[in-house]
């Protein structure tokens, strides 16, 4: 069975709950580029937009840490808009092993830096799913919610603020999954931030 056909016949889950998102300070918490300006895990460049969130606040920040550290930037110096939202969505639940089996994919496919499989799973948009729920690539134990732009009206912002990452999140750095081809310079930056710890970040901000 082709992946698109498997998605069309996959079970649907009604997802209700609260999720966390962080993004640029200049945009509302529930906005995304549409069409997408660049590729992402569950979208290709030029496709309808996808908005990403995490089931935990630290999961949302972990995505920032993963990408900014890769660029050689200290993520604790970056200001972002972070917020909590309430969702009611029909999702393709890839955290469920039976659903993954139905699609013929495994967790390794979902976490890989090769987005070929996950971008193909975005066919769920054309099968009238609102979103994809999947294991998070950045922080083990968290879940990523990838919401297709047509379903953004089903997301209710509860609160948001512009801030730097809390210093306590320095404890997350050793837990974040690195990209598969992380340069040595990035590994050194990550090690420096980890050694500095939360208290050093607090002192730096005083």
Swiss-Prot record:
InterPro entries, per database record: RES_dom
MF term (GO), any: nucleotidyltransferase activity
Enzyme class of the recorded protein, top EC level: transferase
Keyword presence, Nucleotidyltransferase: yes
EC annotation from Swiss-Prot or TrEMBL: 2.4.2.-
Catalytic activity: phosphate + NAD(+) = ADP-alpha-D-ribose 1''-phosphate + nicotinamide + H(+)
Family the entry assigns: Belongs to the MbcT/ParT/Res family.
Described function: Probable toxic component of a type II toxin-antitoxin (TA) system. Degrades NAD(+) by phosphorolysis. Neutralized by its cognate antitoxin Rv3188.
Quaternary structure, from the entry: Forms a heterotetramer with cognate antitoxin Rv3188.
Name of the protein: Probable NAD(+) phosphorylase Rv3189
């Amino acid at each position: 069975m082709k992946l698109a056909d498997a998605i069309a016949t996959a079970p649907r889950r009604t997802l209700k709950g609260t999720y966390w998102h962080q993004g640029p300070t200049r945009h509302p918490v529930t906005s995304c580029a549409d069409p997408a300006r660049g590729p992402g895990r569950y979208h290709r460049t030029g496709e309808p937009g996808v908005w990403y969130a995490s089931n935990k606040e630290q999961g949302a920040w972990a995505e920032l840490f993963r990408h900014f550290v890769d660029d050689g930037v200290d993520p604790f110096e970056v200001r972002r808009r972070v917020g909590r939202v309430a969702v009611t969505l029909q999702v393709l639940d890839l955290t469920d092993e039976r659903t993954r089996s139905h699609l013929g994919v495994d967790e390794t496919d979902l976490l890989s830096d090769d987005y070929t499989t996950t971008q193909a799973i975005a066919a769920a948009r054309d099968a009238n799913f609102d979103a994809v729920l999947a294991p998070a690539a950045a922080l083990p134990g968290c879940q990523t919610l990838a919401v297709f732009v047509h379903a953004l009206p089903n997301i209710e912002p509860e609160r948001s603020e512009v801030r730097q990452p809390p210093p306590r999140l320095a404890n997350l750095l050793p837990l974040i999954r690195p990209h598969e081809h992380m340069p040595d310079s990035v590994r050194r930056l990550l090690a420096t931030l980890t050694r500095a710890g939360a208290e050093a970040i607090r002192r730096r901000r005083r």
